[in-house]
Amino acid sequence: MKLRGLYAITDSQLLAGRFLSHVEAALDGGVCLLQYRDKSDDAARRLREAEGLMKLCERYGTQLLINDDAELAARLGVGVHLGQTDGPLTPARTLLGRQAIIGSTCHASLELAAQAASEGASYVAFGRFFNSVTKPGAPAANVDLLEQARAQVKLPIAVIGGITLDNAAPLVAHGADLLAVIHGLFGADSAQEVTRRARAFNALFAS
């Protein structure tokens, strides 16, 4: 599977009361990867929401990933995204199998990206590139890093951190394969606007 396009990431608080409807609206607009991100300790709700997302992703032909929970990913038979504090990647690869999509947060570090590649990552994620509501204190990255990563790391490159339709184009131009977006997509006032934004993000890859 070619990893290129919009990488939608959920936020359960942002999407409260409209979780599945807005996610489906995004999928209708075109989503390459969908990451279920929920940092709460409510395991039952997380399983229920993840199962709902899995059904939607199957309907739209989108790959689902779970943030920071390889065991839940294994239970559902989907991929996982791991941050630098979420444990090593190799055990997750062993647990999920060779075909699973596994992503790794690399902040602004080519060294972390090289390590992730050596451990079997499917893609590497750099950021934050702009001011981020979700992770305001994350290390900053810039477009020069993307060109260096393109030359050194032979994996798809995801970018994250404050990405909107107003600032995403230069990231794609400098080598980003995946635009990982939370508020810039799901912060829309209506499901119709979520769909419009999803299509607009994907259009950046067609130009």
Swiss-Prot record:
Gene: thiE
Sequence similarity: Belongs to the thiamine-phosphate synthase family.
The protein's name: Thiamine-phosphate synthase
GO MF term list: magnesium ion binding; thiamine-phosphate diphosphorylase activity
Record EC number: 2.5.1.3
Residues reported in the UniProt entry to bind Mg(2+): 68, 86
Coiled coil: none
Keywords associated with the record: Magnesium, Metal-binding, Thiamine biosynthesis, Transferase
CDD domains the UniProt entry points to: TMP_TenI
GO annotation terms (biological process): thiamine biosynthetic process; thiamine diphosphate biosynthetic process
Pathway field: Cofactor biosynthesis; thiamine diphosphate biosynthesis; thiamine phosphate from 4-amino-2-methyl-5-diphosphomethylpyrimidine and 4-methyl-5-(2-phosphoethyl)-thiazole: step 1/1
Annotated 2-[(2R,5Z)-2-carboxy-4-methylthiazol-5(2H)-ylidene]ethyl phosphate binding sites: 132-134, 162
Residue numbers binding 4-amino-2-methyl-5-(diphosphooxymethyl)pyrimidine: 35-39, 67, 105, 135
Cofactor: Mg(2+)
Role summary: Condenses 4-methyl-5-(beta-hydroxyethyl)thiazole monophosphate (THZ-P) and 2-methyl-4-amino-5-hydroxymethyl pyrimidine pyrophosphate (HMP-PP) to form thiamine monophosphate (TMP).
Keyword Lipid metabolism in annotation: no
Cofactor note: Binds 1 Mg(2+) ion per subunit.
